[in-house]
Regions:
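Hydrophobic anchor at the beta1->P-loop junction of P-loop NTPases
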Residues: 426-428
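Short beta-strand-centered segment that lines the nucleotide-binding/catalytic pocket of NTP-utilizing
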Residues: 449-465, 476
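The conserved Walker
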Residues: 432
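Active-site-proximal beta-alpha core segment in soluble small-molecule metabolic enzymes
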Residues: 5, 10-12, 30-217
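Conserved lysine of the Walker
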Residues: 436
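Short phosphate-coordinating micro-motif centered on Lys-Gly-acidic
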Residues: 487-563
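Active-site anion/phosphate-binding pocket segments in diverse small-molecule metabolic enzymes
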Residues: 1-19, 27, 69, 95-97, ...
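N-terminal pre-Walker A segment at the start of P-loop NTPase domains
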Residues: 393-415
Length: 563
């Protein structure tokens, strides 16, 4: 039996949150493209799943640290199908003596951080072309040290490195210049303007010496959000794509990671007894406790002992005593407490350490005396199962999805529209204000039709001409099409056939061929199903974090099934 079959802890990764964050950075960077940094296993989120999810969301390129990461990523993407094969991947950490033949063959763009690296690259690229291992110049990105003093060609080596690479454009294609900000999370730092000036000078120097450098990038997460002047042709965000805003830019990023573990037992600790090693906590009264299956062997730092809180069934409880190798203890409350929250915690319940509820990643980082970047990479080891939620939905079968914002609803609609065929009837149901028209706006974008999608409140039926896909859209309020009231619906027992619906459309001078369009019918249940044998019923319901319907909440559950 695989260990993960009996796992007691999970790292839950929300792919919808990642897609949302990608869209935030696309909007901030436009018209520049986005290179997503997916080093360190996508900041511990699982690169094999996260990278294609980012590409599906609109990321143009991927960046990693090491050549090993790059080769793994290329193989993983190749396994997913042809549409991912040509994804540009850049890696910037390697040694001058490393053999690069397999890197060249995989089409990886290598970063050049020193003169020694440039010499090694030129030598190996010349040999690869001479021996026909490659048929075109190999791709590289010239790294310049603008002030971080870590990686990047130093000022002392800069001219010689540029001249060397400019003399060997027959075997090395320098795609651009890249650098890294030292203090972009401190917008007022003078270092930012200094690095910006040096980067612009480096690009100009390259172009004056015969290197066109068409694709340049220096903006990390905070620079993308705070310094639009540094967008250039690409931005290169990392931690922000996973929902962390290190500069407090105020954008609506959604953290994608939740760490949780099972409660394995509960007990009553008598007054005066100690808990965990060295008895750093003692019961001041008879106290009910729970043991949670997570410890420092799983990446939970001992430094948070007695400081952290966990969330179980929506209620926050303090962790007590020392963090152990495999487990922690949580105080539930007085043993004689008859409140449901105290006694309701049972073995098998999930205790959330940080993430979607309770303690945020930023708050946990403060408790641990570190930064959110490190917290993301803390959970580790085979005892924690990585679980993915959301991602690109498959509308070929029945399913459901929870969306948090109107933008997410449009994006879901766009994914739906991209998968629909001509002749499909989509029946949209849900209360007023649920988001039916918002979903339709996204669906229209996925179909690529012409014209602005508006609510059918005033115009009962609206046609949208086909775009490149050759599929049009017919958007209607189906109840009003047949003279019914939304609140009352279709009269009980009334039978509606295909001809009645077509006659109603013809009476409004709508002459679209149903087989050439997608029909989206708001309030369409019991009305438009006779139009096609391909009917997708979509229900939108309001929701909230607690699960109860909440008119003020943007959270929606979208459920679909084929009729």
């Amino acid at each position: 039996m695989n260990m993960s079959d009996r796992h007691l802890a999970e790292l839950v990764v929300d792919l919808d949150a990642i897609a949302h964050n990608v869209r935030v950075f696309q909007e901030a960077a436009a018209p520049a493209g986005v290179m997503a940094v997916v080093k360190a296993d996508a900041y511990n989120h699982g690169v094999d799943v996260v990278a294609p999810a980012m590409l599906d969301a609109g990321v143009e390129q991927l960046g990693v640290a090491t050549l090993g990461e790059a080769l793994h990523l290329r193989g993983s993407l190749n396994d997913l199908g042809e549409r991912y094969h040509s994804t540009p991947i850049t890696a910037w950490m390697w040694m001058p003596g490393d053999e690069l033949a397999d890197v060249f063959a995989a089409g990886i763009t290598v970063g050049v951080p020193s003169l020694a690296h440039a010499k090694s690259l030129v030598e190996q690229a010349e040999r690869a072309l001479r021996e026909t291992q490659v048929s075109a110049p190999v791709r590289a990105s010239l790294m310049v040290d603008t002030g971080l003093s870590r990686s990047g060609v130093s000022p002392a080596e800069w001219q010689q490195t540029v001249e060397l690479l400019a003399a060997h454009t027959d075997c090395v294609d320098i795609t651009g210049v890249m650098s890294h900000m030292a203090s972009a999370d401190e917008p007022q730092s003078e270092a930012n303007d200094l690095q910006a000036t040096r980067f612009a000078q480096a690009i100009e120097f390259c172009r004056n010496h015969g290197l066109p450098v068409p694709c340049n990038h220096i903006a990390n997460t905070p620079a993308t959000l705070n310094r639009p002047d540094l967008a250039y042709e690409l931005v290169r965000p990392g931690v922000g794509l996973y929902g962390i805003d290190p500069a407090g830019a105020g954008v609506e990023l959604r953290p994608a990671m939740t760490l949780r573990a099972r409660v394995i037992t509960t007990r009553v600790v008598p007054k005066g007894e100690g808990v965990s090693y060295s008895h750093t906590w003692r019961a001041q009264r008879d106290t009910r406790t729970a043991v949670v299956a997570l410890g420092y062997a799983d990446g939970l730092p001992r430094s948070v002992s007695g400081k952290m809180q966990v969330t179980i069934n929506g209620k926050v409880y303090p962790q007590i005593g020392r963090v152990c190798m495999d487990q922690i203890v949580v105080e539930l409350g007085p043993a004689d407490d008859t409140e449901a929250e105290t006694s309701a915690v049972q073995p098998g319940d999930w205790a959330v350490i940080f993430g979607e509820v309770g303690t945020s990643i930023d708050e946990f980082a403060e408790l641990a005396g570190t930064i959110s970047y490190e917290v993301l990479t803390m959970p580790r080891g085979p005892r924690i199962a990585r679980v993915f939620r959301g991602g690109k939905p498959d509308f070929s079968g029945d399913g459901s999805r929870t969306v948090a914002t109107a933008d997410d609803m449009r994006h879901l609609g766009e994914q739906l529209g991209a998968q629909l065929e001509a002749g499909t009837v989509v029946v949209l149901s849900g209360p007023l204000g649920a988001g039916k028209t918002t979903l339709t706006q996204g669906l229209a974008a996925g179909l690529g039709v012409k014209g602005r999608v508006q609510s059918p409140t005033f115009t009962i039926v609206r046609t949208h001409r086909a775009g490149q896909r050759g599929i049009g859209l017919l958007h209607m309020d189906a109840y009003r099409l047949l003279g019914a009231d939304v609140d009352e619906g279709i009269e009980p027992g009334r039978h509606i056939d295909r001809n009645e619906v077509l006659d109603a459309l013809e009476s409004l001078d709508i002459d679209a061929d149903i087989d050439d369009v997608v029909v989206v019918a708001e309030w369409g249940r019991g009305v438009v199903e006779p139009l096609s044998d391909k009917v997708l019923d979509v229900q939108i319901d309001r929701g909230s974090v607690s699960g109860a319907a909440d008119a003020a909440s943007e959270i929606r559950t979208v459920t679909w099934h084929w009729g």
